[in-house]
Amino acid sequence: GPWLLAVAVFLGSFVLFTRHNDFPYSYHPDESGKCGQVIKGIRNYHHPLLLLSLTDVASRVGFVARTPQAIVETGRGVAAALAAGAAAALALLAWRCAGLLAGWCAGAAVALQADLFETAHYLKEDPALVFGLALSLLAAHLWWRAPGRKTLRFLGIACGLAAVGKYVGIIVLIFAVPLVVWHRASDAALTRNVRLRLFAFAFAFTFLAGNLPLFATKLTSPFRSVSNEMKGVAGGHRGITREVPHREYLDMLRKDLPPAVGLLAGAYVLALLGTARRRTPPEWVTVLLPLGYLAMISCSPKIASRYLLPVSTLLPLLATLGAAEIAGVVRAADSRWRRAAGAAVLAGLAGWIVWTELPPLRTALAGFTRDDPAEVAAWITANLPPDSVIAEDHRVNLSPDKADGAAKFARVPQKVLDANFAPDLGSVDELLAKGVTHVAVCRASYSRYFNDETGAQGSGKTGYDKRRDFYQRVFRDGELLREWPRGTITYLQPGIRLYRIAPAKAPAPAP
């Protein structure tokens, strides 16, 4: 039944999403700050507090050591659980729409989606957002089919979880409120005003409860934090902006979307258009939500592949529903053989979806086993003179902690100067004067300064030009000693280059 479906999809997804999630916390630029909030009892409200609160509770219940690595790994487990919850919710949604077999197929298709698998490995809020969106879609279908107080409260709670996952999750209100207003409940006492009050109370209670600063002793202004985040989304990030709308996310989908997923999701859209009169509003919402979300993020100059996660996660669901529509053409309720043929068609098309999803999933899984920063540190230890001085982009990770100067706990015996961006340590000439002999740069850091579609934002032009000029000179005048190319998992394979900028020492004369 559906409970077995939900439990099996959740457990299977959770086991998959927690594989190889023990890499160093310093590899992800955001995880150190988040674990610091948990350990120090600080909350900055850059994002809603659901993920951090669950991480804090899980670490205390599990008697986890209050160290950065232990807390981050606990938080990654929480993120994996939320992602697994999203897969289970979408499996139940497919069951409600197209039957139990479709539910199993959708659960497998969503769980094996490579972007969801990767993002579930980080202490980041994106899985919490996807969980809330998936639960909201399920709740919308349940409310429409059985309008009552329980399903209405569930819809309010689910929408609250979407908003408390990430602030952008509040977009669920765009479809949830009209569904509450337009759809009459079976209970005559549930008038429009009563429905709105019940929904609003459930939503507000969930949002406020999820943002309670549990175990926190120091808070920053939530209004200032939210304002800063919104400015970054609307205006750009780290002094860099671009023209909007842009096609970055469409290009990502075109490049990464498995063909079976795209074709069968398109088939579902065509099926809805061809039978529009007998379709329910929640069915249309299931299609329009990812399309609307894609349009929204394409109007923000702040770009990251993880922002596409809600779209990437919902597309396998739509593809499975498309497969179910095709199977429905074959199947006839009064014929056992036709029903069996329809089930075979659905299973076969779902197998096609899974088969096209497996190559990127295998690549992502293998990516979490390749640790380039550790290889770089080992190579430097073995091949550079002990008196070398290395300036690095922090993403190279010779220094686990951001030092903004000389690193105290370098992973190599050589002296390391560390900053978020190596140019912030000084110009090439200034670094040479300080005795710097080598520069280690990271594509994940410098590539933004060589993208024709990006540019400096207002007062950030001076810093933008300084960083670009620094990298250009290193690439032009430095001697490339070794390169570790960028890989699938950019936090473990960020694309590292090691240059010598000081003249090579002449060999000592023979005695």
Where are these regions (language model features)?
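Membrane-interface transmembrane helices that cradle and orient dolichyl/undecaprenyl
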Residues: 96-97, 136-154, 162, 184-186, ...
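Transmembrane-lumen/periplasm boundary regions of multi-pass, lipid-linked membrane glycan transferases
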Residues: 34, 41-47, 53, 60, ...
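Transmembrane alpha-helical segments
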Residues: 15-16, 322, 342-370, 408
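Transmembrane-helix motifs of polytopic, lipid-linked glycan transferases
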Residues: 65, 73, 77-97, 135, ...
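Short acidic/glycine- and proline-prone juxtamembrane loop motifs at membrane-interface regions
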Residues: 115, 121-128, 304
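Short periplasmic/luminal acceptor-recognition loop of GT-C membrane glycosyltransferases, typified by
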Residues: 381-416, 432, 436-447, 491
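Aromatic/acidic, Gly/Pro-rich catalytic loop(s) in extracytoplasmic/lumenal soluble domains
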Residues: 426-429, 434-511
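Transmembrane signal-anchor helices characteristic of membrane glycosylation enzymes that use polyprenol
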Residues: 2-27, 108-112, 201-217, 295, ...
